[in-house]
Amino acid sequence: MNMSKQGIFQTVGSGLDHILSLADIEEEQMIQSVVRTAVTGASYFTSVDQSSVHTAEVGLHQIEPLKTSVDKPSSKKTQGEKFFLIHSADWLTTHALFHEVAKLDVVKLLYNEQFAVQGLLRYHTYARFGIEIQVQINPTPFQQGGLICAMVPSDQSYGSIASLTVYPHGLLNCNINNVVRIKVPFIYTRGAYHFKDPQYPVWELTIRVWSELNIGTGTSAYTSLNVLARFTDLELHGLTPLSTQMMRNEFRVSTTENVVNLSNYEDARAKMSFALDQEDWKSDPSQGGGIKITHFTTWTSIPTLAAQFPFNASDSVGQQIKVIPVDPYFFQMTNTNPDQKCITALASICQMFCFWRGDLVFDFQVFPTKYHSGRLLFCFVPGNELIDVTGITLKQATTAPCAVMDITGVQSTLRFRVPWISDTPYRVNRYTKSAHQKGEYTAIGKLIVYCYNRLTSPSNVASHVRVNVYLSAINLECFAPLYHAMDVTTQVGDDSGGFSTTVSTEQNVPDPQVGITTMKDLKGKANRGKMDVSGVQAPVGAITTIEDPALAKKVPETFPELKPGESRHTSDHMSIYKFMGRSHFLCTFTFNSNNKEYTFPITLSSTSNPPHGLPSTLRWFFNLFQLYRGPLDLTIIITGATDVDGMAWFTPVGLAVDTPWVEKESALSIDYKTALGAVRFNTRRTGNIQIRLPWYSYLYAVSGALDGLGDKTDSTFGLVSIQIANYNHSDEYLSFSCYLSVTQQSEFYFPRAPLNSNAMLSTESMMSRIAAGDLESSVDDPRSEEDRRFESHIECRKPYKELRLEVGKQRLKYAQEELSNEVLPPPRKMKGLFSQAKISLFYTEEHEIMKF
């Protein structure tokens, strides 16, 4: 018998608890009246009984002295957060570089009746969770090559394959490691994932060939691959019956009447808002894994693949194997399926600036077998991209800054940090033009790879070792923004190259450094990189293992350096808020008739091409990260000498709206428009409108990287409509151009691989759009259908033809009579008196003279 001993105060307290409080919250019973009405329940079940009696209870739950089962009782953690084998595949020697060995929707594969976790998931509607995966391979010592395993939020879309290392990733090297583990948080535009009807996948695991598989004689031509996955931090919500459905401040309308500055945040920001109040939006990192991005160094500090070259057994000692210009714009990797120019993260960021400076860090990752042996020497020659280095011998190269790498052993990567050595404080981005002026240079020199010791190996293994080249930047400063889409570089003055990036302390830590100017003090010390900020001692040696995130975090310092000094700029041009606070072109449209409206959605999706999708800089920027939330500033420029009344309004996603991208009469009432919030204007009194679009959405965030899934909802910020009245034929053409910029309340979460160069689409020229019929030519006055019918009628009938011929005869008769009665002096030569030059039209956009 189980007896409990209580003191007098414990007994009294227990009695008071029964009198004054309810029973246990999990199993509750309360007698409410003398007619025995009771409310009972357990968890999410409640029962109201009108003729109830007390519960009959006998005995208490007992603990076994001798356990019948010694395993831990099952729970959500043991059942729902254990590893399950979700995929098996073979990596073959026939797989080319960047071949996708596996592309897995991890959550969909975990939702499987073969796995115990489905017993929990199928009875719930929504969930929040993280994902952890393991990828295992079993190579032999006679096999060499590498794979990259990257967890991509939603879909890879048009991101550069060479920049997959921007995502949470693991590198598999047959000579170094045979397993990688990746753990990711919940990243989604919505607060929870709907198991029965998902909007789009949460996480996609892609496994691609990073270095082709080579084998020795008699070795298997494949390596097997297994993928394990589990949920982490699993939260289940919405109990549901079992379903047979399977998983699927101040106000202003314009800056001045005809002048508006789009160049910087202070002048481009809107002070008028479509919001109900002059409200602010609070920060919320809960759906973005807490990874908020504010600076472009988030991308420039991550290793991304730029080039690959072989170290062959036929290479002689002192032979130059690879020559790499030292600038951040270089990349050589391409792919055919899908067709990509695989730009690196560093080149993608730096291509958008006029000037750069900083220390570039090259990572050389080798893929040998355990039976290969050899050494490489890496040498930096200061100068520019045009210097001739073909005559520099191995002995001469040891005079310059150099490092030697032994490819044999457990360390796979040489990290070579090139110090900033230049005759100018900055280098210029010359890829925007083809002409070259003496003194204008892009690179600070060249990096040369020499054969230091010949490659030796048994005859039954491959006679070469592949080397991947990555690049990053330390103390990087870029300034003076521009728009430019880089092509695959045959580097200026040389057709060989490659670059790499250093890895941060943790993968995907945003803003690992603030570049040359600190955020705390924009006028303070410059060029403070990770090593300077953290104050740590530089590690001895430049060799590391890039496959291991713990070892890859070493701060590179190959050679001793001085601190770079004080920046000449008081503003950090690499700040996202400064860069995108400048207004960038969004779209343009022209009205042809009176009492019409035009609606255009602001969609971030990269699957929508200009002119209906984001063009150029906006397209590039909104695909650099997974999630966006917060308001946007819209600047509308009005062109044409008109006196037209207009009204603009903003419609959040999900509500009634007129047909987008069509000039038409509005089907919406004035009550509906003004209830949404409208702005009235007159085009004679103002030439521009600057207005803030509020963050009004039922979503947590929107995304530009859904690749067609959820494009209509989860990638659209909202819709803007403009309606005009009192537009007549005395007015010139009426055109609107729209520009978009971010605000200080904008938030950007979770970095993505930048768009590959093939997906960078610019706005079409005005002439091409006029030729395509998208815009009306500004040369012709708008005419109604009635005018055109009248003109065609006149041309057909030719009225007064006979009368005009008769008048002509009489005038000729009178002229002849007048000549016969007068003696005229001899005619004088009037040189060029009535000569007329050819008529020409000068079109300013194309800078061409069209002569008629």
Swiss-Prot record:
Q: Which GO terms describe its cellular component?
A: host cell membrane; host multivesicular body; membrane; T=pseudo3 icosahedral viral capsid
Organism superkingdom: Viruses
Region of interest: Involved in P1-2A pentamerization: 766-836
In this chain's numbering, which residues are marked as the site (Important for VP1 folding and capsid assembly)? Answer: 769
Recorded hits in CDD domains, A to Z, give: rhv_like
Per the record's keyword annotation, is Cell membrane included, yes or no? no
Keywords tagged on the record: Capsid protein, Host endosome, Host membrane, Host-virus interaction, Ion channel, Ion transport, Membrane, T=pseudo3 icosahedral capsid protein, Transport, Viral attachment to host cell, Viral ion channel, Virion, Virus entry into host cell
Signal peptide (from-to): none
Short motif (L)YPX(n)L motif, span: 167-171, 200-205
Q: Which GO terms describe its molecular function?
A: channel activity; structural molecule activity
One GO biological process term: virion attachment to host cell
**InterPro entries, per the entry:** Hepatitis_A_VP1-2A, Picornavirus_capsid, Rhv-like, Viral_coat
Q: Where is this site: Cleavage?
A: 23-24, 245-246, 491-492, 765-766, 836-837
Q: How is it modified after translation?
A: Viral protein genome-linked: VPg is uridylylated prior to priming replication into VPg-pUpU.
Q: Which family does it belong to?
A: Belongs to the picornaviridae polyprotein family.
Protein name (record): Genome polyprotein
What are the top taxonomic ranks of the organism?
Answer: Viruses, Riboviria, Orthornavirae, Pisuviricota, Pisoniviricetes
